[in-house]
From Swiss-Prot:
Record organism: Aspergillus niger (strain ATCC MYA-4892 / CBS 513.88 / FGSC A1513)
Annotated membrane topology: Multi-pass membrane protein
Highest rank taxon of the organism: Eukaryota
Record's keyword terms, sorted: Amino-acid transport, Autophagy, Glycoprotein, Membrane, Transmembrane, Transmembrane helix, Transport, Vacuole
Annotated protein name in UniProt: Autophagy-related protein 22-2
Pfam families according to UniProt: ATG22 (PF11700)
Similarity-based family: Belongs to the ATG22 family.
Glycosylation sites noted in the Swiss-Prot or TrEMBL record: 444
Localization: Vacuole membrane
InterPro entries: Atg22, Atg22-like, ATG22/LtaA_families, MFS_trans_sf
SUPFAM superfamilies registered for this protein in UniProt: MFS general substrate transporter
Summary of the function given for this chain in its UniProt record: Vacuolar effluxer which mediate the efflux of amino acids resulting from autophagic degradation. The release of autophagic amino acids allows the maintenance of protein synthesis and viability during nitrogen starvation.
Amino acid sequence: MAFASPPASPPDEDGQARAPRYPGEDTTPTSRQEIWGWYAYGIAAEVFAVCGVGSFLPLTLEQLARERGFLQSSHLPCVGPDSPSAPKESSPAMFRRDDTNEQCVVGLMGLEINTASFAMYTFSLAVLVQALTLISFSALADYENNRKTLLVTFGFIGSATSMLFVFIAPPVFVLGALLVVVGVVCLGSSFVVLNSFLPVLVASDPSIQNSNKESAAELHRLDPEAEYVHARTSFDGDEPTHRPPTGLGLGGATGTSSPELQLSTKISSKGVGLGYCAAVFVQILSILLLFTLSKTSISKASGTLPLRFVLLLVGIWWFSFTMVSRRWLRNRPGPPLESTSTGASSHQPRWRIWLHLVAFAWKSLWKTVKIALKLREVIVFLVAWFLLSDAMATVSGTAILFARTELKMSTTMVALLSITATLSGMAGAFLWPIVSRYFGLKSNHTIMVCIALFELIPLYGMLAYIPLFKKWGVIGLQQPWEIYPLAIVHGVVSGGLSSYCRSFFGLLIPPGMEAAFYALYAATDKGSSFIGPAIVGVLIDATGQVRSGFFFIAVLIVLPIPLVWMVDAEKGRKEGLKISEDVVRGGEGEDEEVEGLLAR
């Protein structure tokens, strides 16, 4: 497959690469083609994140289980000519609403599980496995040629899982759950590896070569109003303090005047924007594909077959743009695996060195936790982030299944719902900085406003339990059209929370420990996001209604508000600065533990 290269970047001013920091480092100046290779993977994988994980995978899992399931009350098939939900009209399945209100369950390991719960449990398991994988293997990306190899491998395997859904029929619906777990793990892992490219590309960019030569290795604090874009989201904290500035999170300048920060923010923001634009484009293509298939006999053969063709399209897209990244990205190798920093000897077999890296990653994370326990403001905010990230993940998954099973919305309507939320999220990322400046809000106050608006979503859904509204048949998410305004709220709020929480946490990090603490931040995010979906799944099984999960979600969303309010950013900055100064002075006693984390 051939791809046209973007315009070549102009040569750097002095025409010389910077000095290598370890044997074998590729210090070739970053080209525009390589930057576009980095963008290409975001364009590839973000489509699976939005169109797959965020839209069609939950629908496909639920529908696969539904076509294999039976009604709990009568034990009649949920789908088929003998089902109470058998269509009375000739409209295609993806445009048709299922008006039955009986609970559909499927037998699994001797249990009767609601088909919506099956999807929730699957994604809960997928996120848990993803978190364990990220913590265990993210350190491998920093050594030898593993960075590009892992990125391409995760991309190819992940895209294959999406394409393989075309072969998953209802009798083997459990295999669909397995593909989801593998796909989600590959998606999250590949984004971690992709982020690890960013500081390398920034460090070798010709535009900052001269500034790096002239700058001193000085610690700067983060501007409260700036968005911190960390250098990498690897879960290891093995960045030595004596290394020269290589970008964000590596001990270099992190203030708004830092050339590395400005360039990294520019590249990262453009990458996110391109990824979301690609996701919206493929989502529109998916709707057109569903519409086209509705004119054929395919839609009548199986309710999941059109969905599986959409996942095939998503997988092909992911694979194709991964090929672009494979061609345009340089290897950018890291230090040799036998580096003594991993605690492994060069005489050991390769697999033992890899095991040392896995153990090293977990020990590094644990050391970071012990350091964080000394910082009250960091701990309070991480607890708030633990709850908030779980709430965000739970709302996203619950909303799709609620639209499908409770509101009986068609596949096309749900796809439009996803597009609405995605476009609103893009708008929210630009809107909240303007709102914050206009009203003079501090970062934590902006987060609290976002959470308060987020709380409106489950509260509105709970209004349907009020007899008056229930009698009206409208208000409280009883009609399909009601969910679209809430999708706008969800998108706008999510865009603000994602950026402001990361930025606010950056204020509390001890200078020079950015990589380790953002690893802890990411671990908290992924480590919590499996709890909420699992609990909602249990509630659905107990009540037979997805709506019952709104009670739990409402409590989960509101809990972080007092915690965020309690965080004193100025006190947290002083605490972080004190620990950082102890490290710079060499540390004494317990502070040697901090230094060990950064200098191993």
